[in-house]
Curated annotation (Swiss-Prot):
Miscellaneous note of the record: Displayed sequence is cv. WMR-29 and cv. Vedrantais.
Organism from which the protein derives: Cucumis melo (Muskmelon)
Subunit structure and binding partners: EIF4F is a multi-subunit complex, the composition of which varies with external and internal environmental conditions. It is composed of at least EIF4A, EIF4E and EIF4G. EIF4E is also known to interact with other partners. Interacts directly with eIF4G. In higher plants two isoforms of EIF4F have been identified, named isoform EIF4F and isoform EIF(iso)4F. Isoform EIF4F has subunits p220 and p26, whereas isoform EIF(iso)4F has subunits p82 and p28. (Microbial infection) Interacts with potyvirus viral genome-linked protein (VPg); this interaction is possible in susceptible hosts but impaired in resistant plants.
Stretches the record annotates as EIF4G-binding: 60-63, 70-106, 154-163
Residue stretches of biased makeup (Polar residues): 13-24
Protein name: Eukaryotic translation initiation factor 4E-1
Stored SUPFAM superfamilies: eIF4e-like (SSF55418)
Keyword Kinase attached: no
Cystines in this chain: C133-C171
Stretch list, region Disordered: 1-52
Localization terms from the record: Nucleus; Cytoplasm
PANTHER family: EUKARYOTIC TRANSLATION INITIATION FACTOR 4E RELATED, EUKARYOTIC TRANSLATION INITIATION FACTOR 4E1-RELATED
GO biological process: defense response to virus; regulation of translation; translational initiation
């Protein structure tokens, strides 16, 4: 998207700080009620009218527009094709819109088992078949079940705040809620570009203050070998 220079943050760090400071509602207090299976939003419907009411008059544009997607766990068993149940939730292009959406959807710890929540650059679908994702791969970080909320938020802020040196390589991120653990992955475009992937993986660990090794899997290998796919890169 095109924005005037005066509206842009002077650096990635400034933009990241701006994003954090623009949050109209902290999440340190009472948590939301547990969701029924397949739910993603709370009591307030996530629609344009509700979001518009909370936006400030002078928005802070992001470098890219981003779209939240949700894969409903209750719909997965009814779909014969993988990915058929993934649906877009909302596309945002400003700091204020991000917080309006983020504060109106449940965080990973409150999602139903087998739910998948995505945040991808606008017009990139979170599917292997998408032309931008087809030759890519993903880095993955594992968390104990229900302990990925902060990691998910920090990942989102780093992505939309353009904190990665090789940010053009990034397609988006996903959090997968499973019985024993939560998994957050960053999807990238060109899996064979080892230098770019290593840069993204190392910086991501720094942003999360994550000390364990993480691995990068090519999408092609994931399609062929499923859970038995092996890491091509480690950082």
């Amino acid at each position: 998207m095109v924005v005037e220079d005066s509206m842009k943050a002077t650096s990635a760090e400034d933009l990241s700080n701006s994003i954090a400071n623009q949050n109209p509602r902290g999440r340190g207090g009472d948590e939301d009620e547990e969701l029924e299976e397949g739910e993603i939003v709370g009591d307030d419907d996530l629609d344009s009218s509700n979001l518009s009411a909370s936006l400030v008059h002078q928005p802070h544009p992001l470098e890219h527009s981003w779209t939240f997607w949700f894969d409903n766990p209750s719909a997965k068993s009814k779909q014969a094709t993988w990915g058929a149940s993934i649906r877009p939730i909302y596309t945002f292009s400003t700091v204020e819109e991000f917080w309006s959406v983020y504060n109106n959807i449940h965080h990973p710890s409150k999602l139903a088992m087998r739910a998948d929540l995505y945040c991808f650059k606008h017009k990139i679908e979170p599917k292997w078949e998408d032309p931008v994702c087809a030759n890519g791969g993903k880095w993955t970080v594992n968390f104990p079940r229900g302990k990925s909320d902060n990691g998910w938020l920090y990942t989102l802020l780093a992505m939309i705040g353009e904190q990665f040196d090789c940010g053009d390589e990034i397609c988006g991120a996903v959090v997968n809620v499973r019985s024993g653990q939560d998994k957050i992955s960053i999807w990238t475009k060109n899996a064979s570009n080892e230098a770019a992937q290593a840069s993204i993986g190392k910086q991501w660990k720094e942003f999360l203050d994550y000390n364990e090794s993480i691995g990068f899997i090519f999408h092609d290998d994931a399609k062929k070998f499923d859970r038995h796919a092996k890491n091509k890169y480690m950082v």
